[in-house]
């Protein structure tokens, strides 16, 4: 119990130094939002977070990004305890938006952890490799979701540390129900597209 108490105190102290930047997550509708929701609920005792994207139209999204940028500047100006900026991003517009937050954090002398979720990042990278690489190399650490992504980012960067942090899932709220009808029951929660791997999974099931 004493060790558990000490661990919780240390975790609270460390998490208080982190400022998280990412999409609207209170009512998660996507993978990144769900990860952030789980971080707040299950991982970080103190979850300092600024939302930099959300809304149903381009104007709302732009206003959310601008307000998030200003809020981040205020927080970094007034709170010297915030030492690490943890930015969740993906590809295309998400990465372009995150680039401004990376630059702002470095301008204030903070460490930057860029947590990349985008499955289309390889396709995105070839659209502007020089600029994208410059943003990545400004970061102190890049977080990827798998070994293959880690290997990929090692080939296009030359500065930041690269670490693997797999997405966490919430523990089940109810006991598992067992089915004994001889059938395979598969629940897929996500966008039905090639990048998510659902078609590969169905193909493997068909073959085996």
Per-region residue spans from a language model:
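A short, histidine- and acid-enriched strand-loop-helix "catalytic/donor-clamping" loop
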Residues: 89-94, 110-127, 141
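Nucleotide-sugar donor phosphate/pyrophosphate-binding loop at the beta->alpha transition
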Residues: 118-135, 171-173
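Donor nucleotide-sugar binding/catalytic pocket of nucleotide-sugar-dependent glycosyltransferases
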Residues: 137-174
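N-terminal subdomain of nucleotide-sugar transferases
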Residues: 2-55, 109
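A short, basic/aromatic alpha-helical/loop segment that forms part
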Residues: 29, 95, 171-174, 193-198
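Conserved donor-binding/catalytic core segment of Leloir-type glycosyltransferases
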Residues: 19-21, 178-207
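Nucleotide-sugar donor-binding and catalytic loop/hinge architecture
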Residues: 10-16, 172-185
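An aromatic- and histidine-rich active-site surface loop
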Residues: 68, 84-108
């Amino acid at each position: 119990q004493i060790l558990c108490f000490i661990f919780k105190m240390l975790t609270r102290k460390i998490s208080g130094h982190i400022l998280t930047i990412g999409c609207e997550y209170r009512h998660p509708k996507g993978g990144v939002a769900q990860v952030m929701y789980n971080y707040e609920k299950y991982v970080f005792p103190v979850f300092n977070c600024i939302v930099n994207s959300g809304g149903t139209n381009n104007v709302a999204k732009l206003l959310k990004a601008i307000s998030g940028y200003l809020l981040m500047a205020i927080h970094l100006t007034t709170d010297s305890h915030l030492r690490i900026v943890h930015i969740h991003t993906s590809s295309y517009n998400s990465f372009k938006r995150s680039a401004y937050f990376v630059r702002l954090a470095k301008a204030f002398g903070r460490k930057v952890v860029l947590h990349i979720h985008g499955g289309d990042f390889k396709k995105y990278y070839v659209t502007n490799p020089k600029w994208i690489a410059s943003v990545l190399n400004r970061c102190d650490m890049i977080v990827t979701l798998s070994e293959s992504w880690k290997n990929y980012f090692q080939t296009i960067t030359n500065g930041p540390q690269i670490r693997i942090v797999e997405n966490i899932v919430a523990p089940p709220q109810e006991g598992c129900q067992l089915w004994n009808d001889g059938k395979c029951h598969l629940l897929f929660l996500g966008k039905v597209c090639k990048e998510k791997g659902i078609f590969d999974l169905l193909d493997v099931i068909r073959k085996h």
